[in-house]
Amino acid sequence: MNKHKTDYAGYACCVICGLIVGIIFTATLLKVVERKLVHTPSIDKTIKDAYIREDCPTDWISYNNKCIHLSTDRKTWEEGRNACKALNPNSDLIKIETPNELSFLRSIRRGYWVGESEILNQTTPYNFIAKNATKNGTKKRKYICSTTNTPKLHSCYTI
C-alpha cells in the first residue's frame, strides 16, 4: 500500500512539472509573438526621425519640417479636413510630398485619410491606397493633419 501512495506522488509530481513547463513555453511563445507584432524595425527607424518640437502644437509630432497630427477618431474625408482646421487654423489633411514621407506614414498605420499628393500617382479624385476603401470619401477613417500643406478640394486618399 505504501508503494501505491508513492506512485501517486510520482505521477502528481510529473503532472505538476509538465504543467510548469507548458506554462513557461506558452508564456515564452506569447512574448515572441507580441514582440513580432509590436516591435517592427521599420517603425522604430522611422519614428526616430519624428519627434515632438516646441513649435508644433501640443500632441503633434514633427517630421520632415512638418507638424503632423494622427487622429484617433474616424471621420469622412471632408469631416477629417474640417477637423484638421478645427485643431489648428493653419492645418489641413497632409499632402505627401516624398517617397520617404509616404513610407514613414505607412509604417505607422494604414487607412488614414490624407490630402491630395502627386507622389501617390492618383489620376482621379477619391482614390485610395487602403483596401476596401470607398471611392467617394464617405467611409469613416482616421486622418492625418499637417500644418504645412493645402490639398486641393475633393481630392482624397488613404494610406
UniProtKB/Swiss-Prot annotation:
Q: What is its main location?
A: host cell
Q: Looking at the keywords, is Transmembrane helix present?
A: yes
Q: Which Pfam families match?
A: Lectin_C
- According to the lineage, what is the superkingdom? Viruses
Q: Which is a Gene Ontology cellular component entry for this protein?
A: membrane
Biological processes per GO annotation: positive regulation of natural killer cell mediated cytotoxicity; stimulatory C-type lectin receptor signaling pathway
Keyword match Membrane: yes
Q: What spans does the record annotate as topological domain Cytoplasmic, numbered to this chain?
A: 1-9
Molecular-function GO term, any one = carbohydrate binding
Q: SUPFAM superfamilies, per this entry?
A: C-type lectin-like (SSF56436)
List the Extracellular topological domains: 31-159
The entry's keywords: Early protein, Host membrane, Lectin, Membrane, Signal-anchor, Transmembrane, Transmembrane helix
PANTHER family given in the database record: C-TYPE LECTIN PROTEINS, NATURAL KILLER CELLS ANTIGEN CD94
By sequence similarity, the record places it as follows: Belongs to the poxviridae A40 protein family.
- Report what the protein is called: Protein A40
Q: Which organism is it from?
A: Vaccinia virus (strain Western Reserve)
**Organism taxonomic ancestry:** Viruses, Varidnaviria, Bamfordvirae, Nucleocytoviricota, Pokkesviricetes
